Structures are given as C-alpha cells and as structure tokens.
C-alpha cells in the first residue's frame, strides 16, 4: 500500500503560513497606509487601508475597530513627531531669551507643517475624526498651546513686551503660526504673489514683524 498523502486542507494551511504577513508590523503598516490615503485626498477607511497594506479586509480590526480609531492613531503619532521637533529646536537654544525662543518655536512649527502637510491636516482639523475622542492628542495639543503661552508669559515677566494684554498677545502668537500654516496648506500664497520656494523666507519675515510689533522699544 502506498504512503498516505497529506490532505488538501493541511496543504492549504501550510501555504497560508508561508505567505508573507505583517505580524507585529501590521499596525505600523496600516497607519502608513491611512496617511498615504489622506495625503492623496482619498477617502480613508479601515478597509481601504487594509487594501493598500495588502492584507485581508478583516485583519486590521484587531488593531482598529473603526475609522476613528485608525485616524486617532495616525494623529497621535503625528502630534508626537510635531512635539519632538519643536522640543528639539528649543533644547538647542536653552539660553536664548523668550522672544528668540518664540521665533525658534514659530519657525519649527511652520517648517514641520510645511514639510508634513498630510500630518498637519490630520491634527489641525476635524475632517478625519473627532479630536476630542483622543485623550493623548488633546493632552499633547494643550501642552503645545501652553508652551506658546509660557514663552510669551516669560517675555512679559522679563519686561520685554510693550504694554498690552498678555492673553491678546498669546492668542495673536498662536493665530500667527497656526494661520500661516493653514494658509500654506490651503494654497493661499500664490494668490499673494509668494511662490513655493519663498514661503519659508516669508514665514521668517512675518515672525520677525510680529516680534518687532510686541517687543518693547
């Protein structure tokens, strides 16, 4: 009698086991896929991210039960990168005065937003998910706002600012960096005669103009 052959189901199981799979990297791959979709202006969904990641439609749901969970993970990572870049810039200039630190903060903020437009879009609007649903994102955003407020409060305490309501100065500083970043993301600068290669220089000039306007003379 000939030797017993392996059953077909067993052969299929072996094939499935040999097929490349993302294993522990699946979460990372799905986040990258969602970011790519957002950068393209495409509709983001867990199933579409799975298709881009070349995994079965059901595989992502062990990590992300819905679209909000997926986009929250993308936003939380973006915010961590954002904070890390700003903190690194400020760490390099610990002895600088508050107004110089605000300038460094503003430039770091704007450069990151200009170089990471998809990330900035996700963390700065409610287009993709309800920001309040992520405690980590809310905390990080609050800490960034507090950093802006703190730098300008230090300038006021050191007598470096012209007489003005501090809260107004802080809101104006926040509006400047956020508003400039949004103008760039939304494609406004060509209408103002500012070409793509000139935007960063314009950011520096606008920050300097703001600082000269609030600084005591």
Cite the ranges covered by each PLM segment:
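Hydrophobic alpha-helical connector segments
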Residues: 73, 87-119, 169-173
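Generic hydrophobic, amphipathic alpha-helix propensity
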Residues: 25-34, 49, 74-78, 82, ...
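Amphipathic alpha-helical linker/stalk segments
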Residues: 76-102, 138-142, 153-157
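Hydrophobic/aromatic-rich alpha-helical bundle segments in the mid-to-C-terminal region
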Residues: 132-138, 142, 156-206, 217
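Alpha-helical DNA-contacting segments of helix-turn-helix folds
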Residues: 38, 71-78, 123, 140
């Amino acid at each position: 009698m000939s030797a017993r052959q392996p059953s077909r189901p067993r052969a299929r199981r072996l094939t499935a086991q040999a097929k490349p799979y993302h294993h522990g990297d699946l979460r990372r791959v799905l986040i990258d896929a969602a970011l790519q979709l957002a950068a393209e202006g495409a509709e983001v969904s867990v199933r579409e991210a799975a298709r881009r990641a070349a995994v079965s439609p059901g595989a992502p749901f062990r990590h992300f039960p819905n679209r909000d969970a997926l986009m929250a993970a993308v936003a939380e990572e973006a915010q961590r990168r954002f904070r890390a870049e700003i903190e690194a810039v400020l760490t390099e200039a610990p002895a600088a005065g508050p107004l110089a630190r605000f300038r460094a903060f503003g430039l770091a903020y704007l450069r990151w937003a200009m170089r990471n437009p998809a990330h900035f879009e996700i963390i700065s609007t409610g287009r993709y998910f309800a920001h309040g649903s992520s405690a980590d994102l809310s905390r990080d955003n609050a800490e960034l706002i507090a950093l802006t407020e703190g730098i300008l409060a230090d300038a006021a305490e050191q007598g470096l600012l012209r007489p003005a309501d501090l809260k107004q100065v802080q809101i104006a500083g926040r509006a400047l960096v956020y508003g400039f970043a949004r103008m760039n993301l939304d494609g406004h600068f060509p209408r103002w005669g500012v070409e793509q290669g000139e935007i960063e220089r314009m950011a520096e000039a606008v920050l300097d103009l703001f600082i000269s306007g609030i600084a005591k003379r």
